[in-house]
Amino acid sequence: MPAKSKDIFVVRCSILGDQNNLLGLAEALKNEFGGEIKVVDIRFRSRVLETLYLHLIQQKHESKIWDHVTSFFCVGDIPAKEEVDGAFVVSTLGAGELPAVYLSKLGAFSIHLGELKRIPYNLIDMTIAHPGHVTKVDEFKLPCAPSSIDEEKLLPKVKRNDLLVAFGGDTGSLTYSRNFYEKTLSLAAIAAERNRLTLKITTSHRTGLRNEEIIQEYIQDRSLKVDQLALYNQNDVPSMGFLLSNAAIALISAESVSMISEALAASAKTVAIYEHALPKEERISRFLEEQLCNNQIMLIDAISSDYIELASLQFPSVSWKTPFLSAVHRKLNKKNIRAAA
C-alpha cells in the first residue's frame, strides 16, 4: 500500500469533462491515502519512440538500466523516480496510456479511466470502464462518472433552493435544434416557478456560441427570471461543484454523462432532457437507462412535454467513491502480494 504521504499524479487531459473525472478520482485517493495532487503534462518525443518504448517494456528481461534511460523517451513534467515510487497515477484517453505506463514503470500504481486502445491491459494496474460501456473482463465498472464534487461541502439537500439548467451540446450524430433549447428553458422556468426555486443556467464547451445566443434571446424575449446565466463562451462559468452547491433540481441535456454524473454526485434531483429520442450513441443511452432503472434520474422529452412533474422525483443515492476505493485496496493488496512472492 502506498505510504500516506505519497502523491497522486494526474496525467493532463485536454478535454474538460475527462480532466474533471480524473480530478475526481485523484480527490478520492487523496482523502483515502493522503498526499498531494499533481497534474503533469508528459509527452513522448515522437511516435517512433512511443512504439519503441511499448516494444521494450513488454520484453521479459528487464534490468536497472531503465532507471537511467527512460527519461530519454519523454518530455514535459517528468517527476523523479523517488517521487513516483509507491504513488498513484491516474490517466484517461489514448494520449494518457503510455505516460501512465511510464510512471507505473517508475513504481506508481496506475489507474486508467476508459478502454485501453494502445497498450495491453496487463501494463496498467487498474482500468475503469466509462459509464455505459460494456465492461470487459479486465475492467472495473463504476455506477457513474467520477466527480471532484464533495457532497459533504454542499448545502443540505432540504435547504437548497436552486434549479440548475446545464446544457451540453452537439456530439457525434446528435445536433440539438433551436426548439430544444427554447423548450428546455420554458420547462425549466415553469418548474422553477411551481417549486419556488431560483433559476440558474449554464453552458459547456459543446454548446457553441450560436446556441448561447439562442438561450440569451429566449430569456430576453420571454422575460424569464434568471438569477444566474453562466455562459462558457463568455468565460463566465464557475465549476459545476459551485453551481450545484445550492441545486435542489438539475435539468441537464441527456448527452452529457459527465454533467449528469456530477449532479448525481451532488445529490441533486436530476432530470436528463432530450430531443424526441435518447442519444443514439449506445454508451450514453445505456448509461441513461441504467440510471432510470435504478430510480436515480428522470428522462424527459423536451419537445413533447408541457411541464415536468417533479413530485415523484427522489434525491439520488448513487455513490462511486466507495466501490472505487474498495477496488483500489483489493488491487493494491494483490499487487503487493505478487511483489513479495
Q: Where are each of the predicted segments found?
A:
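Donor nucleotide-activated moiety binding/catalytic core segment of transferases
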Residues: I215-S258
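A nucleotide-sugar donor-handling region in carbohydrate enzymes
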Residues: L116, Y121-F180, D306-L310
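Active-site and donor-binding regions of nucleotide-sugar-utilizing enzymes
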Residues: V10-F140
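A donor-sugar binding/catalytic signature common to diverse glycosyltransferases
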Residues: I15-D18, M240-E282
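Short internal beta-strands
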Residues: V40-D41, T127-A129, L199-H205, Y274
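Leloir-type glycosyltransferase catalytic cores
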Residues: L288-A341
